[in-house]
Regions:
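Exposed beta-strand-loop-beta-strand "reactive/processing" segments of non-cytosolic proteins
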Residues: 53-93, 104
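Beta-strand/loop motifs with alternating small/hydrophobic and polar/acidic residues, enriched
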Residues: 2-3, 38-42, 46, 57-66
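Short amphipathic alpha-helical molecular recognition features
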Residues: 24-32, 65, 69, 118
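Short, flexible/disordered secondary-structure transition segments
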Residues: 8, 46-54, 91
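Short, non-transmembrane alpha-helical segments in secretory-pathway proteins
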Residues: 25-52
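Compact beta-sheet-dominated globular domain cores
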Residues: 85-163
Length: 163
């Protein structure tokens, strides 16, 4: 009986964490959700990916609004594998897998009127967390800082972000 109760509690915890992650995604501002969606599209396009991934949590968010509906976004976040297979349509029942490492993603892009611009090309870099080195993290940030999104002194990472 105790084993059944333990199993029930663990199952409820897994489902709750999946629901919390979906809630975290839905609470992201729209311009950040679009970036997460872009990263997920690129991730599932790889043939080696077998599971569906969901947004797990933000590590760093930064944006610059220049006016005239133009903005620049930098977002560093985690994706987490679920027990659902790649291509699952209804992801509301997908429970997180704890046997797979998180995927650490960094993305930067220009928006106009709330949409991601094709030029300059959005930068998306996602890698399993254990494989991500400090040099790679530095390279990501440097790449986003040097992207020629705008003229002037402001850069994507010059704004004060929120964690």
């Amino acid at each position: 009986m105790a084993a059944l109760l333990l199993l029930l509690l663990v199952s409820a915890g897994v489902l709750l964490s999946s629901i919390e992650a979906q809630e975290a995604y839905s609470q992201l501002p729209d311009n950040y959700r679009k970036g997460v969606d872009l990263a997920l599209q690129q991730l599932i396009s790889h043939s080696g990916v077998r599971y569906h991934y969901l947004f797990f949590k933000s590590l760093l968010k930064s944006d610059i609004e220049l006016g005239f509906d133009v903005g620049y976004i930098y977002h560093n976040f985690y994706l987490k594998a679920t027990k659902c297979g790649k291509g699952t349509v209804d992801v509301t029942q997908c429970k997180f897998r704890d046997d797979r490492p998180l995927i650490d993603c960094a993305i930067c892009y220009k928006t106009f009127a709330g949409e991601i611009e094709k030029e300059p090309k959005p930068y998306v870099h996602c890698l399993h967390k254990p494989a991500l080195t400090e040099d790679m993290k530095t390279t990501r940030v440097d790449h986003c800082r040097t992207m020629s999104y705008q003229s002037g002194d402001s850069t994507i990472l010059a704004s004060k972000g929120s964690k």
